[in-house]
Amino acid sequence: FKSLSADLNPEADPILVQIGGLIRTSTLMKINSQKRWKPLLERIRLSEDTLNIEIRAEGHTDDKPIPMNSNFRNNWELSSARALNLVQRLSELAEMDQHYFSALGYGEFRPKVDIKNIKDRSLLEEARAQNRRVEIYFDAFIRSKNESIENI
């Protein structure tokens, strides 16, 4: 991502097309129609649990403060917008309903590269560029049907 931008880099689109295809054709996304998984799914159903499948995008920014004239109030908003743009594109490419997708933003608080001790300006800018990213996670987990907000 460019600094202060949530727009997807057009150069990343071929990779996103591949990721969308992987999601669409993955065994996990077809689990309900495959005989070999019926015993597992029945066991989950009988235990009153559900199998949740989620494609999650986690957005990140560099450490630079957001200027007053920006479209975003802070790095949390910017990182969230990056993640949201990515999941919307992946949903489109995977040809899947958006309920499988989630997006969240961490702002500058989970950097890939710690920049505290980097003195060289070009190395610092390179590190900041690495921190401007969205990470994609493909999760499957079992959730109790009885689980509610009151129990958490």
For every predicted segment, state its role.
Residues K2-E11, I15-Q18, I23, M29, ...:
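Periplasmic OmpA-like peptidoglycan-binding domain that tethers envelope proteins to the cell wall
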